[in-house]
Amino acid sequence: STGEELFKAKACVACHSVDKKLVGPAFHDVAAKYGAQGDGVAHITNSIKTGSKGNWGPIPMPPNAVSPEEAKTLAEWIVTLK
């Protein structure tokens, strides 16, 4: 599956969109914040798998039911969305 296919098939769309903030940040903003960092893909992958809080406001992101490979595919796609 591609990152975009996973984004649509998994729960991501409940809180995120590519270009505007919903409950969670827009993926454009995530790409802008982490895409240029050497560990950006790893950071996003970890956040997808284990959850995240405090980076984008008060609402935490829960851990997501995706495989490590799916999380990495999603993260690699997200950083291309600058």
UniProtKB/Swiss-Prot annotation:
Residue ranges that the Swiss-Prot or TrEMBL entry lists as coiled coil: none
Database matches in PROSITE patterns: CYTC
Record-linked Pfam families: Cytochrom_C
Residues noted as binding heme c in the record, renumbered to the chain: C12, C15, H16, M61
InterPro entries for this protein: Cyt_c-like_dom (IPR009056), Cyt_c-like_dom_sf (IPR036909), Cyt_c_ID (IPR002324)
Presence of the UniProt keyword Transcription regulation in the record: no
UniProt modification remark: Binds 1 heme c group covalently per subunit.
Protein function: This is a prokaryotic monoheme cytochrome, unreactive with mitochondrial cytochrome C oxidase or reductase. It functions in nitrite and nitrate respiration in Pseudomonas, but it is also found in other bacteria.
Name of this protein: Cytochrome c-551
Organism: Pseudomonas denitrificans
